[in-house]
Regions:
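A short acidic, Gly/Pro-enriched loop at the edge of an enzyme's catalytic core
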Residues: 1-11
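A short SAM/SAH-binding and catalytic strip from SAM-dependent methyltransferases
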Residues: 9-25
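SAM-dependent methyltransferase
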Residues: 45-117
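Short conserved AdoMet
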Residues: 22, 39, 150
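Short glycine-rich, flexible loops that bind phosphorylated cofactors or substrates
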Residues: 2, 19-20, 53
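A short glycine-rich, Lys/Arg-flanked "PGG" loop and its adjoining helix->strand segment in the class I
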Residues: 28-40
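C-terminal lobe and adjacent flexible extensions of AdoMet/dcAdoMet transferase-like proteins
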Residues: 107-150
């Protein structure tokens, strides 16, 4: 859907969805679109995973999510000299004794690359955090949270 320019005060992109776009060119186009639909001074809030940490430490499995109803397993296959990682998931539905599996490629976008793309799209006041509490970015944590403005 196309939105009018300068329509929104805030745009959100959470849940590591941005990196489903599999090239920097695609991400740049999306970010420029977000910039266009924000009102002057509007805010863009973004959350992906901290791929500097994931790649640097060769993290191959994300924390297990388990409730009384489901068990959700998430793994990464890191490929040498390839900006894409293979993201594999298994969702076990306990009551039905059924497992649904999936695999997709994600662009392992590092923090410096993301900041550069945001700047190229026109964003300013770019701040990155290690979580939604706005704790300092860096170190061994999975989230990468961004706040920036038009």
């Amino acid at each position: 859907t196309d939105f009018q320019p300068s329509k929104f005060d805030v745009v959100l992109c959470f849940g590591n969805t941005l990196v489903h776009l599999q090239s920097k060119a695609s991400i740049q186009k999306m970010l420029k679109g977000v910039f266009t639909v924000l009102k002057p001074g509007g805010q863009f809030l973004l959350q992906i995973l901290h791929y500097d940490y994931i790649l640097g430490e060769r993290i191959t499995e994300l924390p297990l999510i388990e409730t009384e109803n489901i068990r959700f397993i998430r793994k990464y296959v890191i490929q040498e000299n390839n900006p894409l990682v293979r993201f594999q998931t298994w969702l076990e539905i306990k009551k039905e004794e059924q497992t649904v599996s999936n695999e997709t490629s994600l662009l392992a976008l590092k923090s410096v690359e993301l900041i550069e793309l945001l700047q190229k799209a026109g964003f300013c006041e770019i701040e990155i955090y290690s979580n939604f509490k706005r704790d300092a970015f860096g170190g061994k944590h999975l989230p990468l949270v961004v706040s920036c403005k038009k």
